[in-house]
Amino acid sequence: MPLNREDKQAVVAEVAAQVAKAQTVVLAEYRGIAVGDLTTLRAKAREQKVYLRVLKNTLARRAVEGTPFAPLAEQMTGPLIYGISEDAIAAAKVVNDFSKSNDKLVIKAGSYDGKVMDKAGVQALASIPSREELLSKLLFVMQAPVSGFARALAALAEKKQAEAA
């Protein structure tokens, strides 16, 4: 069923609101993908707080107009699913991980920090560890010298007790 003018304006406003707070937009071609697979992708996207939607390209172009994602409009051709996220890597990671297991989902382009990326750029962005992973690695690196020092002190205390006995 075709959308009337008010419905189209509502869709553009909704997507424009998502794009306004987004850091990353990823476009992927979904030609021939099964409904069950698309449902799985949407569930994974929801878990990662990624706005995932199939849109008419004309409406998507209107939504990104005047934003840092405007140069991405040139890539908006064919049947596309749009992944939009506030997290810098979440949309790229969700779409890239799913495209590895489903060859019908093909990453077409993406945009981050006002720059348009090709498929390789989106895959590179997806390979970056998440913020939580980076923080845990940093904590481990900071904690290692302290725990080593504590073990050395414990060994020294044991040695002193052994000498005293």
From Swiss-Prot:
Source species: Burkholderia thailandensis (strain ATCC 700388 / DSM 13276 / CCUG 48851 / CIP 106301 / E264)
Annotated InterPro entries: Ribosomal_uL10, Ribosomal_uL10-like_sf, Ribosomal_uL10_bac, Ribosomal_uL10_bac_type
Family: Belongs to the universal ribosomal protein uL10 family.
The UniProt record lists the keyword Ribonucleoprotein: yes
HAMAP family according to UniProt: Ribosomal_uL10
Keyword Ribosomal protein on entry: yes
Assembly with partners or alone: Part of the ribosomal stalk of the 50S ribosomal subunit. The N-terminus interacts with L11 and the large rRNA to form the base of the stalk. The C-terminus forms an elongated spine to which L12 dimers bind in a sequential fashion forming a multimeric L10(L12)X complex.
Protein's GO biological process: translation
Source domain of life: Bacteria
Gene coding for it: rplJ
GO-annotated molecular function: large ribosomal subunit rRNA binding
Keyword line: Ribonucleoprotein, Ribosomal protein, RNA-binding, rRNA-binding
Name this polypeptide is given: Large ribosomal subunit protein uL10
Job of this protein: Forms part of the ribosomal stalk, playing a central role in the interaction of the ribosome with GTP-bound translation factors.
Any one Gene Ontology cellular component term annotated for this protein: ribosome
